[in-house]
Amino acid sequence: MKEAIKKKAIRRLQILEGQIRGLQKMVQEEKYCIDILHQSLAVKEALSGVENLILENHLETHAVEQMKKGQSIKAVREILSIYKLSRKRS
């Protein structure tokens, strides 16, 4: 993994960790449901950002290497499988 992307991903995951702890506390304290949902959506968005970083890394490293080695079909299949999974979540 590229060092710059790794650092960004770890930092964002640390922030997410705090957000999830906050979300858990909100549920334990029976905060207003809409406020909990807003926080939950913020967590989802932040996690999506981490996924984007990981995908960026994959495309810039692994996918490029696969294509250089004549494994472009494998690279395309991997990317399509992730794309299909992301569409199911939407």
Label every PLM stretch briefly.
Residues 1-90:
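Solvent-exposed interaction patches of small proteins and small membrane subunits
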